[in-house]
């Protein structure tokens, strides 16, 4: 809890929140360890707000994406903007159940219910997104829980088309990769994301661009609509901060349309 408190002080004192409230707390994670969370409530929050779950990238933490650009974009999204929860997911969990812990279960059974209860959020209007490692996690978790989310999205999703291409530590072994191969799932399933509006963006110089494009192509081949964007830039904070406004506009509309 002290860690969460430190996070909220940093978020509020060093960043212009545009009237939003940043709140830190902890929920039990894999192995019962307390995992810090950062939730952000817009200045004009609804009584039963929608919820956006945003998963961080490798080597980041729950406060990494709560930048000035994020807060400005949240304010610009207007009165229907969602509350946002940024959970901590470890250094390189890749947000799935594996030998190091049940990271996927932690999100679904810990992070989301705790945020809904604390924020009095609408349990039916929930979206999930993330960047890099978190972008993979968002598409993987939504695939494994079809119908749970109104929107699914990723910035610069850390995806690979073959197990031999993956980053060290991303998966336990080849079988683990195959169980969580979202591109193959999109190619073999009619629609792994029923009822969800899909977002995916990637930079022109991002090494994940080919794999992200493969995911978008696989979805479109199946007749699944996906808002896919390739914008100038690489796999870095400058790129991600440049597109917060577009991302939050998309999810605000997706959640408003979900009833």
Segments the model singles out, each with a brief description of its role:
Residues 3-259:
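Non-catalytic cap/lid and distal C-terminal segments of serine-dependent acyl enzymes
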């Amino acid at each position: 809890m002290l860690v969460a408190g430190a996070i909220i002080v940093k978020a509020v004192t060093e960043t212009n929140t545009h009237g939003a409230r940043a709140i830190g707390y902890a929920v039990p994670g894999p192995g019962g360890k307390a995992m810090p969370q950062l939730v952000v409530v817009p200045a004009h929050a609804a009584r039963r707000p929608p919820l956006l779950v945003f998963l961080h990238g490798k080597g980041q933490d729950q406060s990494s994406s709560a930048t000035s650009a994020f807060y400005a974009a949240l304010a610009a999204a207007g009165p229907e903007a969602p509350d946002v929860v940024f959970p901590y997911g470890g250094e390189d969990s890749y947000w799935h159940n594996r030998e190091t812990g049940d990271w996927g279960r932690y999100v679904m059974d810990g992070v989301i219910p705790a945020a809904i209860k604390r924020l009095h959020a609408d349990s039916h209007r929930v979206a999930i997104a993330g960047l890099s490692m978190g972008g993979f996690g968002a598409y993987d978790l939504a695939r494994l829980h079809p119908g749970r989310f109104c929107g699914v999205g990723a910035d610069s999703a850390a995806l690979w088309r073959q197990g031999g291409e993956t980053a060290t530590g991303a998966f336990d072994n080849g079988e683990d990769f195959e169980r969580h191969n979202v591109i193959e799932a999109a190619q073999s399933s009619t629609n792994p994301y029923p009822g969800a509006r899909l977002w995916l963006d990637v930079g022109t110089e991002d090494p994940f661009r080919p794999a992200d494009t493969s995911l978008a192509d696989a979805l479109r081949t199946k007749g699944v609509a996906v808002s896919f964007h390739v914008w100038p830039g690489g796999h870095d904070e400058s790129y991600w901060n440049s597109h917060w406004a577009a991302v939050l506009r998309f999810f605000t509309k997706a959640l408003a349309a979900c009833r």
